[in-house]
């Protein structure tokens, strides 16, 4: 039997500090994490505090479109 739309969807989290600063000159790249969220419990965009290896500190990572 087929189910309806799944409640859990994969999302990409991207460092907001790297995007705003245009990435450090020493390192190229933007920190991204893949996680899941429940569409019914969190309908708005997800923001989590994660470690960014390019900024060398914990920064806010926000949900982006695929």
UniProtKB/Swiss-Prot annotation:
Keywords: Chloroplast, Plastid, Ribonucleoprotein, Ribosomal protein. It is found in: Plastid, Chloroplast. InterPro entries: Ribosomal_bL33 (IPR001705), Ribosomal_bL33_CS (IPR018264), Ribosomal_bL33_sf (IPR038584), Ribosomal_zn-bd (IPR011332). The keyword Magnesium does not apply. Its main location: plastid. One of its GO terms (cellular component) is chloroplast. Transmembrane segments: none annotated. GO terms for molecular function: structural constituent of ribosome. SUPFAM superfamilies: Zn-binding ribosomal proteins. The keyword Ribonucleoprotein applies. It comes from the Eukaryota. One of its GO terms (biological process) is translation. PANTHER family: 50S RIBOSOMAL PROTEIN L33, CHLOROPLASTIC (PTHR43168), LARGE RIBOSOMAL SUBUNIT PROTEIN BL33C (PTHR43168:SF2). Belongs to the bacterial ribosomal protein bL33 family. This is Large ribosomal subunit protein bL33c. It comes from Helianthus annuus (Common sunflower). The lineage of its organism: Eukaryota, Viridiplantae, Streptophyta, Embryophyta, Tracheophyta.
